Amino acid sequence: MSYQEKNAMSPIIDALVPMVVEQTSRGERSYDIYSRLLKERVIFLTGQVEDHMANLVVAQLLFLESENPDKDIFLYINSPGGSVTAGMSIYDTMQFIKPNVSTVCMGQACSMGAFLLAGGAPGKRYVLPNSRVMIHQPLGGFQGQASDIQIHAQEILTIKQKLNNLLAEHTGQPLEVIERDTDRDNFMSADQAVEYGIVDAVLSHRGE
């Protein structure tokens, strides 16, 4: 995950999105596949974590809470990580809203993606069997006067400590273990992620 004061919005690639057609009492109604799954309280967090994507995820979380504050939300994650500030806006919203947010890793949850995966509701955090999880310390760079660099260096250390404390809380690992294991890129298999406490179970089949 990266710490940056200014994050350039990653380019949004227009792609062909499948449409779903439903029969209603008023005739046919078509949805794009993501809107249809949103009706089932499913949100996708895919690709780089950045401000635009984070705003979309936060908006969907708030909308689903307004629709039904007592029903679980399912957040599917396939992300290499990204901006700390964007990721924390998603994390704080997950903790703020009333519904439990169940997290599911498909493909990969690295860096901020892994942090959000661990931040799901206790007992409702899952990983698919061939996915990978990676944790590490925040990354960042800054140019400017020596005094400004010192300020930003202190800020990234503060963020590192905050993230480590939260990860320790969600995984049940001692803080010193988290500090050691996030010092460098630390990749885990699905089973290792369960053992570490980032997720609660490996899902191999729908019925589990």
From Swiss-Prot:
One of its GO terms (biological process) is protein quality control for misfolded or incompletely synthesized proteins. The active site is at S111 (nucleophile), H136. Keywords: Cytoplasm, Hydrolase, Protease, Serine protease. SUPFAM superfamilies: ClpP/crotonase. One of its GO terms (molecular function) is ATP-dependent peptidase activity. It holds the Pfam family CLP_protease. It catalyses: Hydrolysis of proteins to small peptides in the presence of ATP and magnesium. alpha-casein is the usual test substrate. In the absence of ATP, only oligopeptides shorter than five residues are hydrolyzed (such as succinyl-Leu-Tyr-|-NHMec, and Leu-Tyr-Leu-|-Tyr-Trp, in which cleavage of the -Tyr-|-Leu- and -Tyr-|-Trp bonds also occurs). It is found in: Cytoplasm. GO terms for cellular component: cytoplasm; endopeptidase Clp complex. Its EC number is 3.4.21.92. Cleaves peptides in various proteins in a process that requires ATP hydrolysis. Has a chymotrypsin-like activity. Plays a major role in the degradation of misfolded proteins. Fourteen ClpP subunits assemble into 2 heptameric rings which stack back to back to give a disk-like structure with a central cavity, resembling the structure of eukaryotic proteasomes. HAMAP family: ClpP. Belongs to the peptidase S14 family. This is ATP-dependent Clp protease proteolytic subunit.
